Amino acid sequence: RALDRSDPARSLDALWDGVELRVDLGAVDGRPFVNNASFGVYAEIVSSPAYRDDKAATVLKLLPDLLTGHSGPRLVAHIGANAVEEPQAVLVSNNSYGTSDLAGLSRRDRLDRGVLGVVTLSVSNTREAVDLLRLNNVRGLTQTTAREVIVEADTPEIPVGVDGESLLLRTPVRCTVHPGALRVLVPRDRPGVRVAAPVFDWVRLWRTAFPS
């Protein structure tokens, strides 16, 4: 599932006619992750009991309110040689999601580019939060790639979501990428890379999920 297999039963073909691929692994303080590590508001969402049952709906429901009401530790994200001061949310992924995906809800086209994808969100009110979800508030958004991300805080420990698991880690927290570290056996006869999904319309998705 973590590698986006829509038909797990077909993976059994790899046992008798498989091809080995190498994909990257992320790591947070040495703990490996295939998908992402989340900080700030993102980590609060991962700790929600509803998250495991419906990831997308939980993100859509909680993200705007958490962004504007966040009162957790003050974070500083060191992304390569650059620093983002006091973002409310930081998402570090094993390779990048699409530019319209601010919360790791979509697929990644590749897992072998040897980089971390990084998203940070910073808003000061509800209007800015909605504009950010519409991708109109680019000043509150950082999207980039790096080989290393270090997250500092004004507390000795911070919540971190690692591939959907909620953890408490000592600061600073260091995220790295290990190119080609994971060997994956896949069927020789398999689908190609899927066409990228259309641009996320966060506001439309929110209204569809919560029409009231």
Language model features: what each stretch is:
Residues 1-55, 180:
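Small-residue-rich beta-alpha loop regions that form the catalytic core of phosphotransfer
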Residues 6, 10, 40, 54, ...:
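Conserved active-site and cofactor/substrate-binding residues in soluble primary-metabolism enzymes
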Residues 31-44, 85-94, 98-100, 117-120, ...:
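Short hydrophobic-aromatic micro-motifs
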Residues 44-49, 101-104, 131:
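A short secondary-structure junction signal
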Residues 51-60, 98-126:
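Gly/Ser/Thr-rich active-site loops/lids in small-molecule metabolic enzymes
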Residues 53-81:
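Accessory alpha-helical/coil subdomains and C-terminal extensions
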Residues 71-112:
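Oxyanion-binding "anion nests"
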Residues 79-84, 110-113, 120-212:
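ATP/nucleoside-binding phosphotransfer catalytic cores, i.e., glycine-rich phosphate-binding loops
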